[in-house]
From Swiss-Prot:
Domain named SCAN box: residues: 30-112
Name of the gene: ZNF449
Pfam families on file: SCAN, zf-C2H2
Assigned GO CC terms: nucleus
UniProt-annotated location(s): Nucleus
Biased composition (Polar residues): 292-304
Protein name, UniProt field: Zinc finger protein 449
Assigned keywords, A-Z: DNA-binding, Metal-binding, Nucleus, Repeat, Transcription, Transcription regulation, Zinc, Zinc-finger
Length: 518
């Protein structure tokens, strides 16, 4: 049947013209969503957000309705329960709805002449023999007969006699011991099955009936089913197949005898599960550590049976600054602030002005700088209606109206509105000039003065006029030059109403009014 199914699938694939083209993105996103592991994320929040993103990429809730999403989920589950070869064949055609899936499978069944609800004989046989509580053996599991591993004088004995031990419970070697053990282990210690039985069990009447039954003959003749521990050669007789299958039949009988005992113990343990654990967070931490050993290495001498006590999330106290700069030791309350501060040490200036090419450490600095190009002055004085590009400039200006001068020089008694102005003034008393030019050795009391001076050595002129292309070393020079193009004359004489572009021109003009008075 497997050969016929494979040939039919290959023939259908060769007739690919009857199917429409499909989009593979949906299948890719579905596989990413289903195969995502917790250890791929840095924490629970990132893992949940990643799953949410993958699920939205797969189901596309903004484009699909609720009914379409439900149909997509049911379609996925339906394909999962199909046989492997049929599931692969259907997925390759990527049907767009459930009607297409059903029609594809019906066409394949009609081509193979298979009944709609065909049940494999070996599955039906296991369901009849295995009572409630016994382990279900997957049909694709490889059974290796222990008779092939017996060494010594007992090799010449029949297969069934050589396999059954003289004392102690028999060990089932299915080739997948870990899977069977995980299936039987519910998390609590289960009693060992007393599967010791004698050779007289072979004379049970149901065994004889099973050997002579039509279903057993079909199972032995079929190439689909269990892979017995010996190779099925073409010239192997039915009698040899029966001898090989016989230990498996006896094993089923032993499991059937122990089924009620296993079920009784399971019910007793199930009653103990009604009380939930006291600390669910501890159990969750255990589960995460067991499933994700790569997240944290456990010391070799540690006791794994000791309960884990995860540290609770520690709240930040007001004023706490846990993020410290390794270069200068300065601390910050947020990691983003530390990242911006570290750019000072590295010299990185990622934010570039598209107008003049000047670079800045922070985006806020770039935003304030761009106001110079746009002429935006969002801060307005309520007294004189003068506007400023920065709020700090507005606050300093408002002190001139209130005559508030909080910063006073102790040397000469002069007061200032800004602390920075007082600091610059104090340098006139001390004669301090900490900023020195490395080219000519000249010193300056202010850093801005040194910056302007250094442009004389480099001939840098960063301030360019957009009208005529002329460049200037200082921004005030550019502002005065722009008044030539705009015709602006902000300085007005109070005597004759004449206006001037520069304050120096107004002062020289006012001298003409006072000459007659002198």
């Amino acid at each position: 049947m497997a050969v016929a199914l494979g040939c039919a699938i290959q023939a259908s694939l060769n007739q690919g013209s009857v199917f429409q083209e499909y989009d593979t993105d949906c299948e890719v996103f579905r596989q990413r969503f289903r195969q995502f592991q917790y250890r791929e994320a840095a924490g629970p929040h990132e893992a949940f957000n990643k799953l949410w993103e993958l699920c939205c990429q797969w189901l596309k809730p903004k484009m699909r309705s609720k009914e379409q999403i439900l149909e997509l989920l049911v379609l996925e589950q339906f394909l999962t329960i199909l046989p492997t070869e049929i599931e692969t064949w259907v997925r390759e055609h990527c049907p767009e709805n459930r009607e297409r899936v059903v029609s594809l499978i019906e066409d394949l069944q009609r081509e193979l002449e298979i009944p709609e609800q065909q049940v494999d004989m070996h599955d039906m046989l296991l369901e009849e023999l295995a009572p409630v509580g016994t382990a279900h053996i997957p049909p694709t599991m490889h059974l290796e007969s222990p008779a092939l591993q017996v060494m010594g004088p007992a090799q010449e004995a029949p297969v069934a006699e050589a396999w059954i031990p003289q004392a102690g419970p028999p060990e089932l070697n299915y080739g997948a011991t870990g899977e069977c053990q995980n299936f039987l282990d519910p998390g609590y210690p289960l009693p060992k099955l007393d599967m010791n039985f004698s050779l007289e069990n072979r004379e049970e009447p149901w065994v004889k009936e099973l050997q002579d039954s039509k279903e057993m003959k079909q199972l032995l003749d079929s190439k689909i089913g269990f892979e017995i521990g010996i190779e099925n050669e073409e010239d192997t007789s039915k009698q040899k197949k029966m001898e090989t299958m016989y230990p498996f039949i006896v094993t089923l009988e032993g499991n059937a005898l122990q089924g009620p005992i296993l079920q009784k113990d399971y019910v007793q343990l199930e009653n103990q599960w009604e009380t939930p654990p006291e600390d669910l967070q501890t159990d969750l931490a255990k589960l995460v550590d067991q499933q994700n050993p790569t997240l944290g290495e456990t010391p070799e001498n540690s006791n794994l049976e000791e309960p884990l006590n995860p540290k609770p999330h520690k709240k930040k106290s007001p004023g706490e600054k846990p993020h410290r700069c390794p270069q200068c030791g300065k601390c910050f309350a947020r990691k983003s602030q530390l990242t911006g501060h570290q750019r000072i040490h590295s010299g990185e200036e990622p934010h570039k002005c598209p107008e003049c090419g000047k670079r800045f450490l922070r985006s806020s600095d770039l935003y304030r700088h761009q106001r110079l190009h746009t002429g935006e002055r969002p801060y307005e004085c309520t007294v004189c209606k003068k506007r400023f590009t920065r709020r700090s400039h507005l606050i300093g200006h408002q002190r001139t109206h209130s005559e508030e001068e909080t910063y006073k020089c102790l040397e000469c008694g002069k007061s200032f509105c800004h602390g920075s102005s007082l600091k610059r003034h104090l340098k006139t008393h001390t004669g301090e000039k900490p900023h020195r030019c490395h080219n000519c050795g000249k010193s300056f009391s202010r850093l801005t003065a040194l910056t302007l001076h250094q442009r004389t050595h480099t001939e840098e002129r960063p301030f360019k006029c957009n009208y005529c292309g002329k460049s200037f070393r200082q921004r005030p020079s550019l502002v005065i030059h722009l008044r030539i193009h705009t015709g602006e004359k902000p300085y007005k004489c109070t005597h004759c109403s004449k206006s001037f572009r520069q304050r120096a021109g107004l002062i020289m003009h006012q001298v003409t009014h006072f000459r007659g008075l002198i």
